[in-house]
Amino acid sequence: MALLHSGRVLPGIAAAFHPGLAAAASARASSWWTHVEMGPPDPILGVTEAFKRDTNSKKMNLGVGAYRDDNGKPYVLPSVRKAEAQIAAKNLDKEYLPIGGLAEFCKASAELALGENSEVLKSGRFVTVQTISGTGALRIGASFLQRFFKFSRDVFLPKPTWGNHTPIFRDAGMQLQGYRYYDPKTCGFDFTGAVEDISKIPEQSVLLLHACAHNPTGVDPRPEQWKEIATVVKKRNLFAFFDMAYQGFASGDGDKDAWAVRHFIEQGINVCLCQSYAKNMGLYGERVGAFTMVCKDADEAKRVESQLKILIRPMYSNPPLNGARIAAAILNTPDLRKQWLQEVKVMADRIIGMRTQLVSNLKKEGSTHNWQHITDQIGMFCFTGLKPEQVERLIKEFSIYMTKDGRISVAGVTSSNVGYLAHAIHQVTK
């Protein structure tokens, strides 16, 4: 009460005795964020939420970007389980990793991407840092470009591209441009359009390329097309920014999936590269990735590494430990690595097999459309060519969920539901 009598009344105490003051204080406290608008829902998560609410026993979720086994269940690779057991038996500590991550993981990641006999590795003219999966690698790379790529702020993305590419580069301060990639008429690669657009990109700009299993289309250039693209990139003196989220998971052969990256480097094109172990090791929730910059020489690589660490420090200080240990154990233990490569091929082959079965079942349904693009495309995702109104019918009439652009995750297709999917697609396209 002394405070009240003194005339020096604290606001909170005064509000307790005067309801009007309390209301005013409450209004002031709640007024900071009244201008913040509700953000749009994530299109992929929206598909999943609608799927969960559906009670149809035949419902299918073809929107999820994660591998499923032939029973439609999440799959933990046996090689991952073995690696976890080996790590647990060592009773290791939980100390912080260095800013750049687990050294043995970074070295093995670079070898996996560039090849064990790569000249880049032998000369030491590269730097690899551990990142928070592929998304983190992209953001680190984009932030480095924003700070040090003095030639241009423009980054050219394929049309279409993974939805997260746009906000990652935009939020890092880069200017977004595009180049033709997908041809809706053929549901394939618009090679002529892509080369024409790339050849007109201003010199010393950044060009984003999907190394393999293009997301969302599943459409990849053939090796001879990659060669022509590399020739144009070199002629225009463009900086090639590779996103490789599916090495091994696309074709079942890690070397084949990394061919484009290695070819560009062999042609004297210095690139940067983002890797993810979410798909090819099934380490989705562990957030395991890497960012590699190929440099002019070892001295330049050391300077780039120092600046990458300066970028990482205020973002998240250092990367997670557990997933990197798992990936490193698999990559650096010969028997585990051999087992893992076999398991990756099994996953890739299952997806390839589902594509073939889907086309076969569409023919059995009597469909007269050309569905060859389904088997021509590669990787987890398939651009079906379905129109938005056809997708809407699939959702409403058959409880088959996918994004409005007709993209499906082939990983969600199994031998037990592929016939139902083919029947439904035929019904909405005949």
UniProtKB/Swiss-Prot annotation:
Report the residues modified as N6-succinyllysine: 73, 90, 107, 122, 159, 185, 227, 296, 309, 338, 363, 396, 404
Q: Which residues carry this modification: Phosphothreonine?
A: 48, 333
Enzyme Commission number(s) from the entry: 2.6.1.1, 2.6.1.7
* Pfam families named in the record: Aminotran_1_2
What are the Phosphoserine sites (modified residues) in this protein? 143
Q: What induces it?
A: Up-regulated by long-time exposure to alcohol.
Q: At which residues is Asymmetric dimethylarginine found?
A: 313
Q: Which residues carry this modification: Phosphotyrosine?
A: 96
Record-stated family: Belongs to the class-I pyridoxal-phosphate-dependent aminotransferase family.
PANTHER family on file:
ASPARTATE AMINOTRANSFERASE, ASPARTATE AMINOTRANSFERASE, MITOCHONDRIAL
This chain's function reads: Catalyzes the irreversible transamination of the L-tryptophan metabolite L-kynurenine to form kynurenic acid (KA). As a member of the malate-aspartate shuttle, it has a key role in the intracellular NAD(H) redox balance. Is important for metabolite exchange between mitochondria and cytosol, and for amino acid metabolism. Facilitates cellular uptake of long-chain free fatty acids.
Tell me what this protein is called.
Aspartate aminotransferase, mitochondrial
